[in-house]
Amino acid sequence: MRIQADFSLDFPRAYGTLEASADFRTVPEDFQVTENLGFEPAGEGEHVYLWIEKRGENTAWVAEQLAVYAGVKPTDIGYAGRKDRHAITRQWFSVYLPLKSNHPEPEWQGFSSDRIQVLRVARHVRKLRRGEHESNHFVIGLRQLQCADKTAFHERLDCVLRSGVPNYFGEQRFGNAGRNLIEAESLLVGKKPYRDRQKRGLILSAARSYLFNQVLADRVRKGDWQISVAGEPCAYPSGPLWGRGRPLALVELLARETELLSSWRDWCNELEHVGTSQERRALLLAIKTPSYRWLVGDHLELAFTLEAGAFATSVLRELVSLNNQQLRLSGTESSD
């Protein structure tokens, strides 16, 4: 059985050694996330859509409170992605409330509080499901940013925003100090049973994510993470999300990935019989609508948009060493 020391989360950076540091998330305003569904609610249907801004609360807790307030089952609540607790976030929730039912529609503004604000109400024809949104827009504050060479930092910043970064799963996917990976070892190798389906799903997701990061880390070390290689099954450079069925990579790339993950063969074998099907994930994370500005003192504000499922911390880790590592304990991802 593997132990905690076997699970390194120090994945290689594409742009070399960090020469800058900054304070991060000293206040919730330093991390703001706005969800983009990619479609507008239809204006009619059996599901009420609520555009909610939350501060200092996690998505699952808000969903639970919303079910209680609306008097519906927890399964009647939908949302596209978990958003960070230590932030100001705006996202959609759906509530199953057919117009013809005997269940009266609540006064939604009554759900608002000092930490939760209902900003918009609409109706739609279907429940909002996980991963259904298109992207997230981030506004991030980095305070007390220190760098030996500001010109070099600006060059690195411009290069990162223009060229993109390795599409690593963020450390928060793996739990505090990689705890989810220890749980994955117990589940996949030790055959520990998990009755909590949600917890089991999180553990399996962490395992798949860690194997993907191993493959991406190898591509970063070899310098070919931005280009397609022989055997690539997608129209873009990709890595495996292990699961049911046969691997999707073709002969050359499959041999390379299989060899790289040979020490994780026990995990791969188990993942082929549980959870979701084999998938591929892009190795390159493109950064859309990037901008930045310097505020008072050494306070840098970054703004950019990432596709669903991407991590803002994958961008930040290529720029600065973050003094406040509270982000490791919470989800800053777009769609999980």
Swiss-Prot record:
<dbReference type="InterPro" id="IPR050170">
    <property type="entry name" value="TruD_pseudoU_synthase"/>
</dbReference>
<dbReference type="InterPro" id="IPR020119">
    <property type="entry name" value="PsdUridine_synth_TruD_CS"/>
</dbReference>
<comment type="function">
    <text>Responsible for synthesis of pseudouridine from uracil-13 in transfer RNAs.</text>
</comment>
<dbReference type="InterPro" id="IPR020103">
    <property type="entry name" value="PsdUridine_synth_cat_dom_sf"/>
</dbReference>
<dbReference type="GO" id="GO:0160150">
    <property type="term" value="F:tRNA pseudouridine(13) synthase activity"/>
</dbReference>
<dbReference type="GO" id="GO:0031119">
    <property type="term" value="P:tRNA pseudouridine synthesis"/>
</dbReference>
<dbReference type="GO" id="GO:0003723">
    <property type="term" value="F:RNA binding"/>
</dbReference>
<dbReference type="InterPro" id="IPR011760">
    <property type="entry name" value="PsdUridine_synth_TruD_insert"/>
</dbReference>
<dbReference type="Pfam" id="PF01142">
    <property type="entry name" value="TruD"/>
</dbReference>
<feature type="active site" description="Nucleophile">
    <location>
        <position position="84"/>
    </location>
</feature>
<keyword id="KW-0819">tRNA processing</keyword>
<dbReference type="InterPro" id="IPR001656">
    <property type="entry name" value="PsdUridine_synth_TruD"/>
</dbReference>
<keyword id="KW-0413">Isomerase</keyword>
<feature type="domain" description="TRUD">
    <location>
        <begin position="164"/>
        <end position="298"/>
    </location>
</feature>
<dbReference type="InterPro" id="IPR042214">
    <property type="entry name" value="TruD_catalytic"/>
</dbReference>
<comment type="similarity">
    <text>Belongs to the pseudouridine synthase TruD family.</text>
</comment>
<dbReference type="GO" id="GO:0005829">
    <property type="term" value="C:cytosol"/>
</dbReference>
<protein>
    <recommendedName>
        <fullName>tRNA pseudouridine synthase D</fullName>
        <ecNumber>5.4.99.27</ecNumber>
    </recommendedName>
</protein>
